[in-house]
Design a protein with these regions (language model features):
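Transmembrane beta-barrel wall of Gram-negative outer-membrane proteins
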Residues: 148-150, 154-185, 194-233, 261, ...
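Gram-negative outer-membrane beta-barrel transporters
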Residues: 318-319, 364-365, 373, 466, ...
Length: 647
């Protein structure tokens, strides 16, 4: 990182606004021309905000809520008040370089990242199911050009981290890169029976290796990537408030192991007016979980193939045509020595297309459609101890996901757009059967989104202002019904979410940047939901605020560059259940950091996260026949130092 990282915010804002291509648009659309709500953060911005895992993105993206429900493999993600009670079928999907990530791997470390794009609102036309709230698209650095390397180490009262990456030019056409990350969370729970003082510790290792074929004078390009992530954790504690306050418990120490292996081959061919893209991916994840509810083992293998053709038909018309295939095999086993097994196979075929047509120099029209066929088979062995009969069932569904958008470039720096888009959560069968009623399965949950947005640059490029008004109606919502412990996942009635999103970036000088973002909305159950009609949707705060400030001290004061950063975020009250009986009150988290760029090769960052040591819950559930609830809790105050070396 050069010294200009801190001293050229003018360059950064001009680059991002005028020439940044939004890869998640799949049509190479510029940020200032896209007709949907998009937020982008570069690697430098993420570093200054202390974002090094996907769950940290809520520090910089207002309206994004990522919280664990038990452990990080079962996370809840909310955008625009849309979340999912079934953690196997989220409403927000995460992609890394165009490859869909397993639902149990949403909260992964950010390794070798170039930037992160957040698309808000249903994205069913381009991305299919599980994108009702939006998508998070992670774009990594690719080895192009000269050889380089990076190493960094962090130490804090809560964890230690080691990071390393290297890029190598093998010849004029062939490049390779590798990235590694190791994280050790120390833990702070005292286990009374064993007197262990770090009973909630964890270790995680992630690695990525890639080979790029990028010839200068050939239309063909290719990238082969192999990645691995290994988590060994004791994080899944469900504590009473008293146990959390005292940081001690007599519960058995939980265990969680998660291994994820990912393989991807991306190929491109430039035919001139048409660019062909192929993305082939295979991801395998294994989970072993021993917790307060027993023992659970599960494996999931996902094979996917996407083909796309982007064509610039004329100066006024560009088109995208694509096809998608996915085969997902899930295999679970409940309890040590138990014969209860569940195998679910899901096969998906989809065709999709989108066209952008310029009606004139200022107004363009976007039309898109996706047609998806999904077939699912469930083979459950039954569980006599839970009085659940065995079943072998098949289910299939066809889904159409249309989109229409209209954009008006009022001036070179101002754009207004409106859109109607759709999204859905696929139907199928429960991956964790709890009742014989699960044999009937459930149908797709579908959402329709209306949006009016704007994006403008004011005051001689000193102010960036964007926002959107949105309305989302969801039909056939998928909910767990019945008595706790034997609930059935089924379709009920309607839900509705509406609100306002605002983002402001102010650059009063080249050395000072101010960011402010907020979301203000209402999300509630509507007709067809019996006793919960009118209640607020779980994990749907009415208000979120994110504020940040970055200031580079005058360089004459120091040798090198010193930057001061602060980020704060407010989340209003959140309900953990549909009946709205369990909740977390509104809270504010504040982070501070000082970064010292000694020279172009060496930098140091002193940081404190959650400086006020604010306590907050991320999940709660009631103990049956009791007024006491068991909960998961957020991370407390962290103080640490990071040292980074680049060459």
């Amino acid at each position: 990182m050069a010294l200009t990282t801190f001293t050229s915010s003018t360059f950064a804002r001009e680059t991002s606004y005028d020439v940044m291509v939004i890869e998640s648009s799949k049509q190479s659309t510029l940020l200032n021309r896209i007709d949907s709500s998009v937020l982008v953060k570069t690697a430098e911005e993420l570093e200054r905000a202390g974002v090094d895992q996907v769950q940290d993105l809520e520090k910089v993206f207002p309206g994004l809520l990522i919280q664990t429900r038990g452990n990080r493999t079962y996370a809840n993600t909310t955008i625009r008040g849309i979340s999912s009670p079934d953690y196997y079928s989220p409403t927000v999907s995460v992609y890394v370089d165009g490859v869909l990530q397993d639902s149990a791997f949403l909260t992964q470390p950010l390794v070798n990242v170039e930037r992160v794009e957040l698309l808000r609102g249903p994205q069913g036309t381009l991305y299919g199911g599980n994108a009702q709230g939006g998508i998070i698209n992670i774009i990594t650095n690719k080895a192009i050009g000269q050889t380089s390397a990076l190493a960094s180490a962090s130490y804090s009262n809560l964890n230690e981290q080691l990071n390393g990456s290297a890029a190598l030019s093998l010849n004029d056409s062939l490049y390779a890169d590798i990235a590694l990350r190791a994280i050790k969370d120390n833990g702070n729970i005292n286990h009374l029976p064993t007197q262990r003082k770090d009973a909630n510790d964890s270790e995680q290792f992630s690695g990525l290796a890639r080979l790029h074929y990028l010839p200068h004078h050939s239309p063909f390009t290719a990238t082969l990537s192999i990645a691995n992530s290994h988590l060994d954790s004791h994080e899944e504690w469900y504590l009473t408030q008293a146990e959390f306050d005292q940081k001690m418990t007599s519960q058995a120490i939980p265990q969680l192991k998660r291994i994820v292996n990912s393989y991807a081959l991306q190929m491109g061919y430039d035919l001139g007016e048409t660019q062909l893209t192929s993305v082939t991916a295979y991801q395998n994840r294994n989970i072993y979980r021993q917790f307060i509810g027993g023992t659970w083992q599960e494996d999931q293998n996902t094979l996917s193939q996407e083909l796309r053709a982007n064509t610039q038909v004329s100066d006024a018309l560009s088109t995208l045509i694509g096809a998608y295939f996915e085969q997902r095999d899930f295999d679970a086993k409940l309890g040590v020595g138990s014969q209860a097994t569940n195998q679910v196979e899901a096969t998906q075929y989809a065709l999709f297309g989108q066209a952008i047509y310029a009606l004139n120099e200022q107004i363009d029209l976007t039309l898109g459609l996706r047609a998806t066929h999904l077939s699912t088979r469930a083979d459950y062995s039954g569980n006599p101890s839970w009085m659940i009969d065995a079943y072998a069932q098949n289910k299939s569904e066809n889904t159409l996901s249309p989109k229409a958008a209209l954009g008006w470039q009022i001036t070179p720096n101002s754009r207004v757009f409106t859109s109607i888009s759709s999204g859905y959560r696929p139907g199928g069968f429960s991956l964790q059967p709890r009742s014989s009623g699960d044999k009937n399965g459930y149908s797709a949950e579908k959402s329709l989104n209306g949006e009016l947005g704007w994006r403008t640059r004011l005051a001689n490029n000193m102010v960036d202002l964007s926002g959107a008004l949105y309305w989302i109606k969801t039909d056939d919502i998928q909910l767990y019904t019945g008595n706790p412990g034997s609930q059935v996942l089924r379709n009920l009635g309607e839900a509705q979410s509406q609100g306002l999103e605002l983002q402001l970036a102010f650059y009063p000088t080249d050395d000072l940047t101010l960011n402010l973002g907020g979301t203000f909305g209402e999300s509630s159950f509507k007709s067809g939901n019996h006793d919960i009609e009118g209640n607020t949707l779980p994990y749907a705060p009415k208000t979120t605020l994110v504020a940040g400030i970055d200031y580079v001290l005058p360089q004459a004061w120091f040798n090198g560059a010193v930057s001061l950063s602060s980020n704060a975020r407010y989340t209003s009250s959140v309900f953990f259940n549909e009946t709205n009986t369990l909740s977390q009150a509104g809270y504010t988290l504040v982070d501070l950091a000082i970064q010292y760029q000694v020279n172009p090769h060496l930098s140091m960052r002193l940081f404190s996260n959650n400086v006020t040591d604010q306590d907050y819950k991320t999940y709660s559930y009631p103990i049956p026949n009791s007024s006491v609830a068991l909960s998961n809790y957020g991370v407390g105050r962290e103080v640490g130092l990071n040292i980074k070396l680049e060459w």
